[in-house]
């Protein structure tokens, strides 16, 4: 069998299409875990998930188990969840508060900063046993941007700022209503899994073409709700709802965005009070507090932007008030974790509205999440058909624009999918030395292999 390094990704990723084996081939999945998740920056969690000393939450970087914990000094640590003795995990609870981590196999005990502090019958190891060198291993590089914690398993490489690039502006927008410390991630996590490749969720989250089809009933209900503002200003919203517009953006480094903001602020000629007050009687009070905290100009800009809808390569999606994390499990299985966020300074009433809006689209009994999962599994199943092994991602290719270092297209264009795949191929081909006939696994070779499996 040819080595994974011999896969010819140039033959599998074209400008306007990608080969279905990229969603189905286990060897390609293994290669992704090494070249993308084990080498680059990966989003791990938000500091708001572990607000107190001793708070922890289990995470993964690729397939590797990690504990995110706030240690006894108040620092957030990323520790590998693996005892240094015989390799058992030292923490099984998904989240909680602890003073230490104790391996249930032989009782080795570690402090929250990873230091090995207890070894039963330590004298049997002899005088050369160096307890201070056997703490839990730490993720080599950890960096924080506005409360978003990223880890890299490589000790050297690009900085987090270099990796994020222009996507930092979208993180700024996500927390723009607040300081980083004011973002709370304490409402739990909604998890679901689907039988499909992780990249299906990445592509779909930035797909502006499908909502009017897949989510038609929810979209109509949302439009009815937004445009039904029971005030004398109703006609202004109806008349100006054409302010709804959007586009797709490729920032580079695999970070892409669906910019389909409703622009209600502009539709109301700069006065959002009628719409805000219609949502909740306390809406105007929160609007006044926002202006007081940020000043009129910054508050106006945030209201005008109306939130972000961004994919940060390879596993973080920011949509509205929600952080969504993709966790690959295998070539045909993925777990998705959704974290709704609250703001400390908002009234409980408005924070409750934030949660209800999350549940309406993404909850287990909601419209949106189940719709998307069904599509992912249908696409994965369809990839088993070998008669036509290509997925088309060329929509809008003829008309995309290069502006200010970005690639921009219309809202339903596949600029975002192309941006993800462009960076994916770059990472998968870096350092490749395979060349020549017989050394690279080409489209034809993979097709033959897939046929043989049948």
Residue ranges of model-derived segments:
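Non-catalytic, topology-defining segments of multipass membrane proteins
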Residues: 1-4, 14, 452
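Short, flexible segments with low predicted structural confidence
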Residues: 2-8, 171-174
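Short, contiguous pre-domain boundary segments
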Residues: 6-22
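Glycine/alanine-rich phosphate-binding loops at beta-alpha junctions
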Residues: 22, 26-37, 42-62
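Short Pro/Gly-enriched beta-strand edge/turn motifs at strand-loop
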Residues: 38-51, 121-125, 304-311
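Rieske [2Fe-2S] iron-sulfur-binding domain
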Residues: 49-169
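C-terminal catalytic domain of Rieske-type non-heme iron oxygenases
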Residues: 70, 75, 140-454
């Amino acid at each position: 069998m040819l080595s994974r390094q011999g896969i010819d990704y140039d033959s599998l990723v074209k400008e306007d299409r990608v080969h279905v084996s990229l969603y189905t081939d286990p060897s390609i999945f293994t290669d992704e875990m090494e070249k993308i998740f084990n080498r680059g920056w990966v989003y791990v969690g938000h500091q708001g998930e572990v607000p107190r000393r001793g708070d922890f939450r289990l995470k993964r970087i690729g397939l590797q188990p990690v504990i995110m914990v706030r240690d006894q000094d108040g620092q957030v640590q990323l520790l590998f969840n693996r005892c240094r003795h015989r390799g058992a995990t030292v923490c099984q609870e998904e989240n909680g508060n602890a003073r230490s981590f104790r391996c249930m196999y032989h009782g080795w005990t570690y402090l929250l900063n990873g230091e090995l502090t207890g070894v039963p019958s330590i004298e049997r190891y002899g005088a050369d046993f160096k307890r201070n060198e056997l703490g839990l291993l730490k993720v080599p590089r950890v960096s924080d941007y506005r409360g978003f914690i990223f880890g890299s398993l490589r000790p050297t490489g690009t900085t987090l700022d270099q990796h994020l690039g222009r996507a930092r502006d979208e993180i700024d927008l996500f927390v723009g209503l607040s300081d980083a410390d004011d973002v709370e991630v304490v409402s739990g996590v909604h998890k679901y899994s689907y039988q499909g490749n992780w990249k299906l969720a990445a592509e779909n989250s930035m797909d502006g073409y499908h909502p009017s089809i897949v989510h038609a009933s929810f979209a109509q209900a949302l439009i009815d709700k937004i445009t039904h503002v029971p005030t004398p200003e109703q006609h202004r919203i109806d008349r100006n709802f054409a302010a709804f517009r959007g586009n797709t953006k490729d920032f580079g480094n695999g970070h892409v965005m669906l910019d389909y903001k409703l622009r209600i602020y502009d539709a109301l000629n700069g006065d959002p009070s009628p719409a805000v007050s219609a949502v909740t009687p306390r809406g105007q009070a929160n609007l006044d507090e926002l202006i007081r905290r940020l000043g009129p100009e910054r508050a106006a800009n945030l209201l005008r932007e109306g939130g972000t809808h961004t994919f940060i390569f390879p596993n973080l999606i920011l949509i509205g008030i929600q952080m969504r994390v993709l966790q690959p499990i295998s070539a045909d299985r993925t777990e998705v974790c959704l974290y709704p966020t609250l703001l400390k300074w908002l009234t409980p009433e408005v924070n409750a509205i934030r949660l209800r809006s999350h549940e309406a689209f993404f909850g287990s009994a909601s419209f949106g999440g189940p719709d998307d999962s069904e599509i992912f599994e249908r696409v994965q199943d369809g990839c088993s058909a070998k008669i036509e092994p290509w997925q088309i991602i060329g929509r809008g290719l003829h008309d995309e624009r290069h502006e200010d270092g970005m690639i921009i297209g219309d809202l339903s264009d596949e600029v975002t999918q192309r941006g993800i795949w462009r960076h994916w191929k770059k990472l998968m081909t870096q350092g490749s030395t395979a060349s020549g006939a017989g050394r690279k696994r080409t489209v034809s070779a993979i097709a033959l292999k897939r046929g043989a499996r049948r």
